[in-house]
């Protein structure tokens, strides 16, 4: 989906630094990664968790496994 090609937008609220962990799909990496969101605005390449991001953007048969492997690699 086109939304998965958008770069993550931190969605700043005033001068407050972004501090809410969300997930975005990275076309370059081919999987989802975390980023900090400020709580206002942003774009639609934002997901509550890695699994929902992978399901939406890749339709991978085992999105939880991919997310688990990605988190363990960090």
Residues covered by each model-derived region:
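Cysteine-rich, disulfide-bonded extracellular modules and peptides in secreted proteins
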Residues: 1-74
């Amino acid at each position: 989906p086109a939304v998965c090609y958008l770069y993550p937008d931190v969605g700043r609220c005033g001068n407050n630094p972004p501090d809410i962990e969300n997930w975005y799909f990275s076309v370059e990496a081919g999987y989802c990664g975390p980023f900090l969101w400020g709580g206002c605005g942003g774009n639609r390449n934002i997901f509550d968790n890695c699994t929902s991001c992978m399901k939406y953007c890749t339709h991978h048969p085992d999105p939880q496994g991919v997310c688990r492997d990605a988190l363990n690699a960090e």
